[in-house]
């Protein structure tokens, strides 16, 4: 690697020629000259290694910044595309369901109107002592039975519609939460999730969520500042401890989380 090559080249530096010219006119013992030369050469090599590591650290830092920038752009594009596709998919499901159940919904409304009308006629017959022929009783009973069936079917369909609306609200809530906390740490995400747990999804949910996220960020700001101060090297020797840390790719994970939410809700349809 580049770092090892630069360090190896630094170790090959030979300062003996320069020292010979320096001590050429100086009367000094060979032992003292050799000792001084050893110390001088070691110092030169040490500074050369430090200089090489400093340049490598700057190059690595610039590369990491570029990678992080590209990762954020890719993550933003992926989440935007997934959200658009999921929104279209849910709209399509809702339209299909309304089309398939339009007849049943209409029948339910008509059944309620018929029940009201039939009840009014019954009261009218009783008030005016109108006697219904016996052969008509079966017809009325059948109509009442059919009416009851329509009422039950209508109630079932409306219950199913309410459940689907609840699922849609759930996935929109989860997407909003995932989008707002994508730049937070895991501990901060847990705090936000705990704080919004009792808040129902509504038009005001986004503003409440934003306020909670900002509050969590602010509460962790001082802690982050202290941590950065502790981790910042104060000496030149500490700056040489070049450590490469693995960066977790959160773009794919964030996209997979959103897809799993939509897939879970879509499976209920």
UniProtKB/Swiss-Prot annotation:
Keywords (A to Z) from UniProt: Viral capsid assembly, Viral release from host cell, Virion
UniProt keyword annotation of Transferase present: no
Domain of life: Viruses
Gene Ontology CC: one annotated term: virion component
Family, similarity comment: Belongs to the T4likevirus capsid assembly scaffolding protein family.
Listed name of the protein: Capsid assembly scaffolding protein
Organism: Escherichia phage AR1 (Bacteriophage AR1)
């Amino acid at each position: 690697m580049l770092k090892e090559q630069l360090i190896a080249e630094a170790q090959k530096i030979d300062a003996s020629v320069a020292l010979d010219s320096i001590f050429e006119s100086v009367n000094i013992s060979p032992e003292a000259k050799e000792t001084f030369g050893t110390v001088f050469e070691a110092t030169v090599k040490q500074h050369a290694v430090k200089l090489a590591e400093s340049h490598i650290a700057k190059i690595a830092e610039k590369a990491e910044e570029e990678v992080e920038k590209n990762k954020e752009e890719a993550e933003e594009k992926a989440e935007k595309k997934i959200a658009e596709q999921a929104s279209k998919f849910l709209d399509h499901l809702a339209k299909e369901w309304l089309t398939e159940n339009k007849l049943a919904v209409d029948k339910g409304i008509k059944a309620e109107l018929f029940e009201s009308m039939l009840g009014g006629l019954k009261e009218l017959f009783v008030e005016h002592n109108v006697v219904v022929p016996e052969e008509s009783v079966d017809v009325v009973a059948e109509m009442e039975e059919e009416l009851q069936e329509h009422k039950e079917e209508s109630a079932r369909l409306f219950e199913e519609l309410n459940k689907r609306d609840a699922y849609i609200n759930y996935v929109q809530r989860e997407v909003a939460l995932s989008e707002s906390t994508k730049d937070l740490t895991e501990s901060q995400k847990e705090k936000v999730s705990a704080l919004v747990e009792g808040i129902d999804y509504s038009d005001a949910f986004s503003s409440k969520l934003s306020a909670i996220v900002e509050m969590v960020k602010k509460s962790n700001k001082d802690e982050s500042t202290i941590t950065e101060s502790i981790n910042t090297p104060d000496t030149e020797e500490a700056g040489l401890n070049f450590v490469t840390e693995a960066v977790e790719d959160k773009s794919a994970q964030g996209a997979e989380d959103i897809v799993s939410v939509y897939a879970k809700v879509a499976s209920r349809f």
